[in-house]
Amino acid sequence: GTLGNLPAPFPG
């Protein structure tokens, strides 16, 4: 995902 490539589907 985003926000530091976190393993979660964050919007962005």
Swiss-Prot record:
It is found in: Secreted. This is Frenatin-2.1D. Expressed by the skin glands. Its main location: secreted. GO terms for biological process: innate immune response. Signal peptide: none annotated. GO terms for cellular component: extracellular region. Belongs to the frog skin active peptide (FSAP) family. Frenatin subfamily. Keywords: Amphibian defense peptide, Immunity, Innate immunity, Secreted. It comes from Discoglossus sardus. The lineage of its organism: Eukaryota, Metazoa, Chordata, Craniata, Vertebrata. Probable defense peptide.
